[in-house]
């Protein structure tokens, strides 16, 4: 699907309604919602149903940065218990005694350590304050560049010559972000021919991110705006 407009917001990664329709199955359909780049208050209640799954990333540059890993949210206790177990070696704790456990499935060692949780919790406590400052910066950028960006994760602009632009910004001490290329051009996806994805390819050739975090001062923002506009 040649759709890039969702970038910076949550999106439906998978809808089981489409899969379950092919089988006789009494299980109610649910969605898996990827929200790696967006975190806000009451988000699950507003965007999902109780049996849906919503995934958040704790990668350092995400809205709630940790050391790595992520969080899965749902009001479906069965799903949460299952994923908690398979990400903890397939083990389900049967009571408060950590040495008395029950192996219910094959699994992986994917549970976070205490340090990861501590960093993520501290950043979650600051989320409202962070979002307020991010919105202020975003509004200044939008006004300066005549854009309507909504994301609180990355601030994306387009440059006709992306690599030259990035070199130019680096000369002024401004770090910029290089976005991933179109996924369908990777060898892995050559097993099947994709439809026309011209919008995706064009956006990939021009899109670059500029500094966008709550620690930026107004002086920093003005400097970045001036250098970007002077380049244009």
Regions found by a protein language model. Give the residues of each.
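Hydrophobic faces of well-ordered beta-strands that scaffold small-molecule active sites
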Residues: 31-33, 54, 176, 210
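Conserved PLP cofactor-binding pocket of PLP-dependent enzymes
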Residues: 37, 90-99, 164-196, 202-208
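Active-site region of PLP-dependent enzymes
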Residues: 39-44, 50-154, 158
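Short catalytic/ligand-binding loop motif for oxyanion handling, primarily in non-cytosolic enzymes
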Residues: 40-41, 62-66, 80, 165-166, ...
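Short amphipathic alpha-helices in soluble, non-transmembrane regions
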Residues: 83, 165-173, 224-229
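PLP-dependent enzyme catalytic core of the Aspartate aminotransferase-like
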Residues: 191-232
